[in-house]
């Protein structure tokens, strides 16, 4: 009994694979999953600091208002709104009659 597997069977005095050109959907799916896994692994190793920083600190936007009195929160909101209102002068308002 040979220790060679089916994939390692010598073909025409060369080592080759009998499954080349296989159109089996399971083989195609396995190849796609393998390629995606490799791509994700490479991206993970390249950008792991950025990725895990997002998980560590979350996707918070803007300053935290935790522990800030409500009066200061309202003052901050008014300042932000006044900054937005000041920019409205740059736009042209067209009114239809």
From Swiss-Prot:
Positions annotated with a glycan in the UniProt record: 20
Keyword list, A-Z = Disulfide bond, Glycoprotein, Host cell membrane, Host membrane, Host-virus interaction, Hydrogen ion transport, Inhibition of host autophagy by virus, Ion channel, Ion transport, Lipoprotein, Membrane, Palmitate, Phosphoprotein, Signal-anchor, Transmembrane, Transmembrane helix, Transport, Viral ion channel, Virion
Taken from the record's topology, the Virion surface segments are 1-22
User: Is Cell cycle found in the keyword set?
Assistant: no
Region annotation (Disordered) maps to 60-85
Q: Lipid link (S-palmitoyl cysteine) located at?
A: 50
- Residues under site feature: Essential for channel activity, possibly by being protonated during channel activation, and by forming the channel gate and the selective filter: 37
What does the entry's domain section say?
A: Cytoplasmic tail plays an important role in virion assembly and morphogenesis.
Any idea what this protein is called? Matrix protein 2
Native organism? Influenza A virus (strain A/Henry/1936 H1N1)
């Amino acid at each position: 009994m040979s220790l060679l597997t089916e994939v390692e069977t010598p073909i025409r005095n060369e080592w080759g694979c009998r499954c080349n050109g296989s159109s089996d959907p399971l083989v195609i799916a396995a190849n796609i999953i393998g390629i995606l896994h490799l791509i994700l692994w490479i991206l993970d190793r390249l950008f792991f600091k950025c990725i895990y920083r997002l998980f560590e600190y979350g996707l918070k936007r803007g300053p935290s208002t935790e522990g800030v009195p409500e009066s200061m929160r309202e003052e901050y909101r008014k300042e932000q709104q006044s900054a937005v209102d000041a920019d409205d002068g740059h736009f042209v308002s067209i009114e239809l009659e």
